[in-house]
Structure formats: C-alpha cells, structure tokens
C-alpha cells in the first residue's frame, strides 16, 4: 500500500516555479518518492493524493486520488464536488422507457442480475433482496474523493465530475462525464457526454456519444458513427 506524505517546502517552491498552485498545500499528499517534475501547470484544490510516478500536466484537480503512473494532461476540471457513489445505485429504465421496470446499476452488474431485476417482477422477494444488496454496495462506494486508477490516461478532456476511473482506463477528449464509473480498461473518447452511468471493463464509448442513466456492458462499443 502506498504511503503518502506532505510535500516539503523545497518541493512546493519547485512546484510553484513550474506553474503549479494549490488552494492549500497542507491538503496535498504525495508518494514517498515524489518529485516536482511530475507536475506542470496544474491547479490543485481540496484534498489531492498523487501516486508514485503519476504525471499531471495543465489540469485542475479537486478532491481526487491519483494512482501510480497515471497520466492527466490538458483537463479543464477533474473534480469531486460532493460525496458520491459514482453512478452506483442509479436507476435505469429497462424493457420500456416509462420507468416501470427499473434496474439499479453498479460497477459489478452482470447481464444475469439485470435480467432478474427487470423480468422477475413476479418474484418480489428475490428482486428486493438483490436491490438491498445493490443499495449496500452503493453506500460502501460513497466517498468525498474520486479515484483515478493506476496507469489510467486522461487527456484533452473538459469536465469530469464525480467519476471514478479504473486501472488502465483511457479518457481522450471527452466533453462531460458526471456521476459515473469508468471501469478498468474502458475507453471514453472524443466529445462524449455521459451522466449517471457505468462503463464496464473494456467498454468503448466514442464518436460524440451521449449517455444518460446508462450501463455500457463489458467490451460493448457505443459510437455515433
């Protein structure tokens, strides 16, 4: 487990000289082997943890944990403004769009579980038991800090708010991501806008796709073109 420390006065001086600033340097934590060269032209607000080897360039970050070897470059705002479950527990209309058969999404949802929740309405006890489990899971995921996983890459994006980003995930040029989870290995591309969503492992969302209250399943591709 990574051990964190406060940046030293000499490191803060070097960071400031490289165009970085912080709302409160006392709220910033860095890995033991941190070097100021990891940051350039960044604004840090609230509480920020910076993992080993993470590189931050020309971005604003608020209330996030940045995993080791992650890259964040050219991001207008990566921020967690409030406590969030990061898309876990959101109700999504299934089968019809009138909301009569909603499914609570979460980042471990399977097709089998979703089918039971949407179709087995004649088994209310089973459905209620699964929904209670999902509610507990969503409560466990609640946090005031967002997470960028190890080796994740976020480049050229605009606004990312209350979104957890998994190990090795890539976000390249997304316009707006809000209240969601991008799981390990998933890809979110140019001009994508998504709210209240989960992108499962290996999912690919690209081409200006618009998502709202949606679960993009494992290795699924969503593209306007």
Role assignments for model-derived ranges:
Residues 1-225:
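Domain-scale signature associated with acetyltransferase and cell-envelope carbohydrate enzymes
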């Amino acid at each position: 487990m990574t051990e964190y420390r406060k940046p030293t006065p000499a490191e803060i001086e070097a960071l400031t000289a490289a165009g970085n600033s912080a709302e409160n340097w006392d709220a910033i934590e860095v890995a033991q082997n941190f070097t100021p060269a990891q940051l350039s032209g960044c604004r840090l607000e609230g509480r920020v943890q910076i993992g080993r080897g993470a590189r931050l360039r020309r971005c604003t970050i608020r209330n996030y944990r940045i995993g080791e070897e992650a890259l964040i470059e050219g991001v207008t705002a990566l921020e967690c403004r409030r406590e969030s479950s990061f898309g876990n527990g959101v109700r999504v209309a299934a089968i019809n769009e009138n909301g009569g058969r909603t499914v609570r999404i979460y980042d471990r949802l399977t097709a089998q579980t979703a089918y039971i929740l949407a179709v087995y309405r004649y088994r209310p006890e089973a459905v209620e038991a699964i929904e209670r489990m999902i509610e507990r899971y969503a409560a466990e995921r609640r946090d005031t800090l967002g997470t960028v996983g190890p080796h994740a890459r976020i480049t050229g994006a605009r606004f990312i708010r209350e979104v957890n980003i998994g190990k090795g995930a890539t976000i390249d040029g997304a316009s707006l991501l809000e209240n969601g989870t991008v799981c390990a290995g998933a890809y979110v591309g140019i001009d994508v806008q998504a709210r209240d969503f989960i992108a499962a492992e290996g999912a690919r969302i690209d081409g200006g796709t618009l998502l709202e209250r949606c679960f993009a399943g494992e290795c699924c591709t969503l593209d306007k073109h």
